[in-house]
Amino acid sequence: MIPVVALVGRPNVGKSTLFNRLTRTRDALVADFPGLTRDRKYGRAHLAGYEFIVVDTGGIDGTEEGIETRMAEQSLAAIEEADVVLFMTDARAGLTAADLAIAQHLRSREKTTFVVANKVDGIDADSACAEFWSLGLGEVYQMAAAQGRGVTNMIEYSLAPYAEAMGITKDGEGEESEEEREYTEEEAEAEQKRLQDLPIKLAIIGKPNVGKSTLTNRILGEERVVVYDEPGTTRDSIYIPMEREGREYVLIDTAGVRRRSKVHETVEKFSVIKTLKAVEDCNVVLLIIDAREGIAEQDLGLLGFALNAGRALVIAVNKWDGIDQEVKDRVKSELDRRLGFIDFARIHFISALHGTGVGHLYESIEEAYDSATRRVSTSMLTRIMQMAQDDHQPPLVNGRRVKLKYAHAGGYNPPIVVVHGNQVKKLPDSYKRFMMNYYRRSLKVIGTPIQIRFQDGGNPFEGMNTKKLTVSQERRRKRMVGHIRDKNKD
C-alpha cells in the first residue's frame, strides 16, 4: 500500500514549501480541471520513482500549555497514521523550545522519524545543524526546500524500505512504466482478461456523517453486525469480500467505528489518510454527498484526489428522501454547475437508510470498471488521433507544426493513451485537454477519467558519429570538390 509521509514542525520552517515542491511534481493531465479545488494539506506526490501521500500537519508552537493540547486533532491523527515523519526545523533560526517539545512528542510515539534542517542555503550548514543532534532522533539531514537541494535524497533515504514493493532499483529508477511501452495485442488481451477476472475493489468515501456507515451496512445486509472498533483497525481500512449476482467485490471500509444496532448513536470516526489510502488501493470510488448540505469543499478535495489517482468514479447523493422538490431542484442545479467537469461520472440520488436507489449503484460501478479496463487496439487509438487532428490541427511550436504519428494503449484502470510524435511535449495544455476530451467522447467512456501521455519520437541517429564518412561518401566528396575547383578555374 502507498506510504504516507507527514511533515511536522513549528510554523515557518518550510513545511508548505516542501509540500508544494513534492505535490506539484504530479502533473497528470487528468487533474487539470477548472473548478476543482485542491486540498492544501493532503497531496499525492511522485518523486525519484516513489509514489506517496504527503501530509502537511500544520504549524505546532509547542507552548507551555502542552504539545498535545496545541496540536489539531487531525494533525495528531496524521502523525499516528503516517509511515514516515519528516520533522522539519529551521537551520537559520536554530533550536527552539517548540522544536524540543515536538521532539519529545515524537519520541513518545516511536514513529520512524527523520530530522530535517531546512534553509541551509548560504550558511555554514554543518555548524548550524550541529545543535539539532541533541534532539535525540538520530541523524540530521540538510535541505533547502525552496531551491530543491536535498529533497530527492531525503525522499530516497526515508522511503528506501518501500523501494522493493514499488519496484525501484538501487540506482533509483523504477521498473519500466506502463506508458513507456506499447502493449502487443496478445498482452492487451491477457491484461484485460486478468483485470476482468479480479474482484472489483470499491471504496465508499465522503466527509463525516454523510451516510457511509448506513450505506455500507445496507450493501452488506441488515442482518450483519459489523464492529471494527478493535486494536489494529484504526490505521488501515477494512477489506470486506462480498458477492452480488455472480460478480465479486471487495468493499474497502473507511468509516471507522460502526455497530449496526447502534448506528444512530455512534459518531463516525473520520480519517483523511485512511480515505486517501483506500482511494489509492481501489478500482472504483463511490463518493457520497449529503443532499441536505450540498457540495462542500471537502467533497471537492476528495473528488480531486480520486481524479489525481485516476480512479473510476460513481457519485451518490444521499438523504434524497424527505426533502421537498424545491430543494431537490436547487441541489441538481448546484451539481450541474460545480461538477460539470466530471460529466463522465454517473450521479445517483439515493436513500441509504431506506434503500431507495441503492440497487442501481451496482450497474454504474460495473459500467465504470468495465470502461476503465476496456481493451482498445492501437489501430483504433491511432485512427481517433488522426480524426482529432483533422478536426483541430496541432498548433505551431517555434514555427514548426507539431506532428502526431500514432497512439497506443499504455495501461488500464485508469485507461492511458500514449500519443507519439514530434515536439508533442511542447503542446499547450489547451490542446492536451482537447485530445483528452476527444478520446473520451470517441470511446464513449463512462465513469472513468482518461489519461493522455505524450512522447516525442526519438532521433534514430542519436549517439552515432555522423562526422565520419563512408568510403563511397569520401569518393563522392572528392569528385564534387574537384568539380567545383575546375568550375572556379574556368
UniProtKB/Swiss-Prot annotation:
Q: List GO molecular-function terms, semicolon-separated.
A: GTP binding; ribosome binding
Please tell me whether the keyword Transport is annotated for this protein: no
Q: Which CDD domains match?
A: EngA1 (cd01894), EngA2 (cd01895)
Q: Where are the transmembrane segments?
A: none
* KH-like domain span: 374-458
Subunit structure as annotated in this protein's UniProt entry: Associates with the 50S ribosomal subunit.
Family statement: Belongs to the TRAFAC class TrmE-Era-EngA-EngB-Septin-like GTPase superfamily. EngA (Der) GTPase family.
Q: What is this protein called?
A: GTPase Der
Q: Which organism is it from?
A: Shewanella piezotolerans (strain WP3 / JCM 13877)
